[in-house]
């Protein structure tokens, strides 16, 4: 199948993060322009969509109505679809002297399927990072008062179940970034097209993918470590309570035994 949009001078890319996961197994290989990543023609004008299993669809040259129709078609294939998807747009201009990325626009010498796939990869990773940056910032806001409470009053107000839940949330974010989106990995398209390394590097710099992932990893580690520390403090507190309960029971047993012995003695 021919890539019709390659003849366009200007092209708009729109990336949408639609849900936690997108099931791609139902698409027929015969209907695809490419399978890694899955790329299909969406409308009669030749607009295409590049789909990623971690819930992102990237559209190139697709009219609004066709995009809406296609997104609706994808909804049954989504796990935990988002009510309001994350969106990123990028202008693509071809027929330029070279390849470059600046201020939300990509300049290309010509348009090819491989170049669009690389652009889609960078856009999709940018959206995943944007979503989890928001989630991690929210967790930071929630856990800071707990740490402040420990520093000020020497106690933990939240229970260990709640704290362990936060640790689980951080591990889940890390799993989705590394295991599904593979944020730190280069796109597979580069394996057969090493000449496009420069394009991907420019996009990586434009969206600061490496720096943002590194910052997010540090925040995830900090939140997880803080929650673990608070959970340990809580567990120790509960253990001390239990120890006092045991001591109390022992004292009570001794008191009962002495009472019974004293009764026998006075008889």
Task: Walk through the language-model features, giving the residues of each.
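Membrane-proximal low-complexity regions enriched in glycine and acidic/polar residues
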Residues: 114-179
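Short, charged N-terminal helix-start/capping segments
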Residues: 56-59, 66, 92-102, 150-158, ...
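Short Lys/Arg-enriched alpha/beta "domain-start" segment
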Residues: 1-109
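Short, intrinsically disordered, mixed-charge
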Residues: 72-79, 134-141, 182
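Short secondary-structure boundary segments
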Residues: 10-35, 113-134, 200-201, 252-255, ...
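Short, flexible segments with low predicted structural confidence
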Residues: 103-104, 148-149, 194-195
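Membrane-associated alpha-helical segments
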Residues: 154-265
């Amino acid at each position: 199948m021919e890539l019709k949009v390659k003849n366009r001078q200007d092209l708009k890319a729109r990336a949408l993060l639609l849900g936690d996961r997108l099931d791609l197994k139902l698409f027929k290989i015969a209907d695809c322009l490419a399978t890694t990543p899955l790329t299909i023609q969406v409308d009669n004008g030749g607009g295409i969509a590049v789909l990623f299993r971690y819930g992102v669809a990237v559209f190139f040259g697709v009219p609004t109505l066709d995009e809406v129709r296609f997104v609706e078609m994808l909804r049954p294939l989504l796990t935990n679809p988002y009510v309001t998807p994350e969106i990123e747009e990028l202008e693509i201009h071809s027929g330029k002297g070279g390849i470059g990325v600046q201020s939300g626009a990509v300049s290309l010498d010509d348009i090819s399927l491989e170049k669009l796939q690389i652009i889609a990869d960078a856009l999709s990773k940018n959206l995943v990072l944007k979503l989890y940056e928001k989630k991690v910032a929210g967790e930071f806001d929630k856990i800071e008062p707990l740490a402040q409470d420990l520093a000020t009053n020497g106690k933990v107000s939240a229970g260990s179940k709640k704290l362990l839940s936060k640790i689980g949330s951080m591990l889940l974010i890390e799993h989705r970034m590394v295991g599904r989106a593979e944020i730190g990995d280069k796109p597979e398209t580069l394996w057969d097209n090493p000449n496009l390394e420069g394009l991907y590097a420019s996009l990586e710099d434009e969206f600061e993918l490496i720096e943002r992932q590194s910052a997010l990893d540090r925040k995830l580690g900090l939140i997880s470590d803080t929650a673990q520390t608070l959970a340990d403090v809580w567990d120790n507190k509960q253990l001390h309570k239990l120890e006092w309960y045991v001591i109390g029971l022992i004292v009570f047993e001794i008191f009962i035994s002495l009472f019974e012995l004293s009764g026998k003695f006075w008889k």
